[in-house]
């Protein structure tokens, strides 16, 4: 299993309860597919570097996970489908 850093931006209009449910759902997608979540950071609402779908802000989440490729691929697939996630990126961390 490799280490990955996942960052995703949630649409700012999402209610707080729905936002928590979304974060739990995507954490569940990872853990149900064999990933281990090492660290979760909520950066909160921040201004975007450029407009995405006429939005200027987004709620940032960062996850550090130890995972196999299947869990990452499933997260990526579902994040692309979900309209509440504006952008996401998965970065493989270098092994030391």
Curated annotation (Swiss-Prot):
One of its GO terms (molecular function) is small ribosomal subunit rRNA binding. One of its GO terms (cellular component) is ribonucleoprotein complex. It comes from the Bacteria. PROSITE patterns: RIBOSOMAL_S6 (PS01048). InterPro entries: Ribosomal_bS6 (IPR000529), Ribosomal_bS6_CS (IPR020815), Ribosomal_bS6_sf (IPR035980), Ribosomal_S6_plastid/chlpt (IPR020814), Transl_elong_EF1B/ribsomal_bS6 (IPR014717). The keyword Ribonucleoprotein applies. Pfam families: Ribosomal_S6 (PF01250). One of its GO terms (biological process) is translation. SUPFAM superfamilies: Ribosomal protein S6. Keywords: Ribonucleoprotein, Ribosomal protein, RNA-binding, rRNA-binding. PANTHER family: MITOCHONDRIAL 28S RIBOSOMAL PROTEIN S6, SMALL RIBOSOMAL SUBUNIT PROTEIN BS6M. Binds together with bS18 to 16S ribosomal RNA. Belongs to the bacterial ribosomal protein bS6 family. HAMAP family: Ribosomal_bS6. This is Small ribosomal subunit protein bS6. It comes from Bacillus cereus (strain ATCC 14579 / DSM 31 / CCUG 7414 / JCM 2152 / NBRC 15305 / NCIMB 9373 / NCTC 2599 / NRRL B-3711). The lineage of its organism: Bacteria, Bacillati, Bacillota, Bacilli, Bacillales.
């Amino acid at each position: 299993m490799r280490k990955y850093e996942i960052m995703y931006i949630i649409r700012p209009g999402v209610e707080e309860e729905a936002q928590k449910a979304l974060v739990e759902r995507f954490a569940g997608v990872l853990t149900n597919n064999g990933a281990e979540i090492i660290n979760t950071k909520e950066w909160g609402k921040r201004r975007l570097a450029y407009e995405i779908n006429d939005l200027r802000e987004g709620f940032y989440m960062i996850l550090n996970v130890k995972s196999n490729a299947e869990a990452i691929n499933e997260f990526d697939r579902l994040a692309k489908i979900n309209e509440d996630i504006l952008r996401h990126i998965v970065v493989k961390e270098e092994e030391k």
